[in-house]
């Protein structure tokens, strides 16, 4: 589909092989003099050819193993790109050995892009082909959401303790909404089902009664959507527990093999049977029915009618269910697929099942679901998994998809290599709702503003030019990125440049400019952000505290003054008017304290107080934080001797 030969002296191939190790890039750069091996064939995830005048790439929807969708053939004096093989029936080479009735794949498709100096930097290289490639590549369902989800976190429930009932999670969404002035959120419920995390794995419709049941779960989704928040769940399609209502020996591998065994012994699911029999999809549809009040699966959960060994029928096609999901405003938003080890074809199939129900697809491991996954746990949870299992270590992939997903290498200098201060940052998972023992809300807010808001700001732009340090240049970090340029469709330009002076902590030393104006320097910034109602505001953060002066962005420079609010878990406080002088403002900030600047007085309040749909108003006392005397005992008196009140006292043991 694309080729070059030795008559083109400046020809080069640039491609990507899978690597999630922070110190080993998956990128290959081959020229006639460096790396060219005649009469050989290699397979790659992405591939580009350039010749000094043009640069091009090939896209394919091949479902080949390891997502190596592009084949590069080297002749005696040529390099060419074509699609890797396609599978139409029964999936990959391993799947063909089985006899289940699999769904057929999409019809084969390949596309070619060719560009000149697409980014206008005066050089024609893979950057130009990659920029053109964005117009032909697939985009995962829900990928456009990622750049907005500044508050992405895990909510943990385990072993029947119900430490985070659904409506408490709703209150925490409101608390973070106030503390971040409405920055979008995504909460992933790790333990939404049965008695919590890993209980009754594979039984997706078993929404936990102890955490509030299906009604509270539905109310959580409705409340979350009012506060610009996505709700998703952790599921497992690898293992089944005997306590699951649909557990049966037919669904297990033969011979039976053990899976994870910390609550009860789980057993490995025969994924090909689960796919081919439609049992897995039926279990997912039964969950969809419970959330949305539909009846696409014939079995009624409340009547004890479970999928078992693929009993019951689906009353609509996958496309018909997808059409229903597209119309709903209070459907769940995403699925996180835990411990999934299958290759590309099977992963594409389960992603289709999940996407058809209106749910964005995300995975545990960075190497899974390259075609469809929008978020990876091990790519974002810094210490989790070790240096060898993070996100994709590829400048080419990050160039193409930085704005679409959280599956790249994040900033974690102790792992070295690409993780040592990447210029674009990378979403880092923090929380306060139990996962990993995290319970510190204040620490969560600090890291959200220090690391994750700048990452999300950059993801609102796509990469157009990538410059690394040369071999003869001294780079102050293990990551050799020197300067990255990004743009958006309206013509705004962002430039991220590495600062040579290094801090003593792990935060990234860089300068970010927007249309030539500095908006971030190391750990202080004044970043523009568009609110959910379309209004623009500016977030100010200075980790070290102190005074700093900033040029205001276009649309703000002619103002006489701006209004600055300090942010707290009670929302905006300590209003202050700041004068504008020659298009600049000088801001005095407390250390590690967030501020928001707006063009005039305004408010950001809760639509309904804490405790919405609950039995008690504000059961977590969130509305009293920092109010001191409002918690005096005299304000909380009552008749404890009333016969209707029962007091139970327990001795410490």
Feature names for model-found ranges:
Residues 1-186, 191, 227, 494-522, ...:
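Carbohydrate-recognition beta-sandwich/jelly-roll modules
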Residues 146-332:
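Aromatic-lined carbohydrate-binding/catalytic grooves of carbohydrate-active enzymes
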Residues 187-190, 229-243, 337-340, 357-372:
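Aromatic-lined carbohydrate-recognition surfaces of secreted/lumenal glycan-active proteins
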Residues 196-199, 241-243, 344-348, 371-373:
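Extracytoplasmic/secreted cell-surface and envelope-processing proteins
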Residues 242, 246-312, 359-501:
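Glycan-recognition surfaces
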Residues 459-540, 572-574, 653:
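Glycan-recognition and catalytic regions of carbohydrate-active enzymes
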Residues 532-556:
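Proteolytic processing hotspots in large secreted/extracellular or virion-associated proteins
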Residues 622-653:
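Extracellular glycan-recognition surfaces and repeat-rich motifs
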């Amino acid at each position: 589909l694309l080729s070059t030969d030795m008559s083109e002296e400046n020809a080069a191939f640039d491609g990507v092989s899978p690597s999630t190790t922070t110190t080993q890039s998956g990128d290959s750069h081959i020229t006639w003099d460096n790396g060219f091996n005649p009469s050989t064939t290699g397979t790659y995830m992405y591939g580009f050819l350039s010749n000094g005048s043009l640069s091009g790439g090939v896209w394919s929807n091949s479902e080949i193993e390891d997502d190596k969708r592009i084949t590069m053939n080297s002749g005696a004096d040529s390099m060419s790109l074509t699609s890797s093989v396609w599978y139409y029936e029964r999936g990959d080479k391993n799947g063909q050995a089985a006899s289940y009735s699999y769904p057929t794949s999409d019809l084969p498709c390949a596309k070619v892009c060719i560009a000149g100096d697409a980014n206008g930097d005066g050089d024609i290289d893979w950057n130009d082909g990659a920029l053109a490639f964005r117009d032909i590549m697939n985009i995962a369902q829900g990928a456009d959401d990622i750049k907005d989800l500044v508050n992405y976190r895990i909510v943990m429930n385990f072993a029947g303790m119900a430490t985070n009932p659904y409506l408490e999670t709703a209150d925490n969404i409101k608390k973070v909404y106030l503390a971040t002035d409405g920055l979008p959120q995504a909460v992933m419920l790790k333990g939404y089902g049965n008695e919590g995390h890993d209980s009754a794995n594979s039984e997706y419709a078993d929404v936990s009664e102890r955490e509030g049941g299906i009604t509270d779960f539905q109310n959580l989704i409705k409340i979350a959507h009012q506060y610009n928040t996505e709700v998703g769940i952790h599921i497992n399609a690898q293992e089944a527990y005997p306590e699951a209502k649909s557990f049966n020996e037919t669904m297990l591998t033969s011979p039976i093999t053990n899976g994870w065994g910390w609550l009860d012994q789980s057993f490995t699911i025969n994924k090909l049977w689960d796919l081919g029999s439609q049992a897995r999809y039926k279990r997912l549809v039964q969950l969809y029915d419970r959330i949305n009040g539909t009846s696409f699966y014939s079995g009624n959960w409340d009547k004890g009618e479970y999928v078992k060994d693929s009993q019951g029928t689906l009353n609509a096609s996958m496309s018909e269910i997808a059409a229903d999901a597209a119309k709903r405003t209070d459907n769940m938003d995403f699925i996180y697929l835990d411990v999934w080890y299958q290759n590309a074809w099977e992963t594409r199939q389960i992603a289709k099942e999940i996407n058809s129900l209106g749910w964005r697809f995300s995975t545990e491991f960075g190497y899974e679901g390259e075609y469809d996954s929008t978020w990876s746990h091990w790519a974002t949870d810094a210490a989790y998994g070790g240096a060898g299992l993070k996100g994709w270590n590829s400048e080419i992939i990050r160039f193409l998809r930085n704005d679409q997903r959280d599956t790249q290498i994040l900033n974690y200098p102790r792992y070295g290599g690409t993780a040592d201060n990447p210029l674009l940052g990378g979403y880092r998972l923090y929380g306060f709702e139990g996962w990993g023992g995290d319970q510190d809300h204040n620490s969560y807010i600090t890291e959200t503003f220090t690391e994750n808001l700048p990452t999300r700001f950059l993801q609102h732009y796509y990469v157009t030019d990538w410059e690394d340090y040369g071999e003869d240049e001294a780079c102050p970090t293990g990551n050799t990125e020197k300067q990255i340029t990004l743009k958006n469709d309206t013509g705004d330009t962002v430039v991220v440049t590495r600062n040579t002076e290094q801090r003593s902590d792990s935060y990234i030393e860089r300068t970010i400019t927007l249309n030539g104006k500095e908006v971030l320097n190391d750990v202080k910034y004044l970043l523009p952000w568009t609110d959910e109602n379309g209004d623009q505001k500016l977030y100010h953060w200075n980790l070290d505290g102190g005074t700093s002066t900033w040029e205001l962005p276009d649309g703000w420079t002619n103002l006489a003054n701006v209004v600055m609010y300090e942010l707290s878990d009670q929302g905006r406080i300590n209003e202050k008017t700041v004068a504008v002088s020659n298009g600049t403002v000088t801001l005095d900030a407390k250390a590690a304290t967030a501020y928001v600047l707006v063009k005039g007085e305004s408010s950001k309040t809760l639509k309904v107080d804490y405790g919405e749909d609950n039995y008690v108003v504000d059961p977590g006392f969130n509305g009293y934080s920092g109010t001191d005397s409002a918690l005096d005992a005299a304000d909380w008196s009552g008749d404890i001797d009333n016969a209707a009140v029962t007091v139970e006292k327990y001795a410490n043991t």
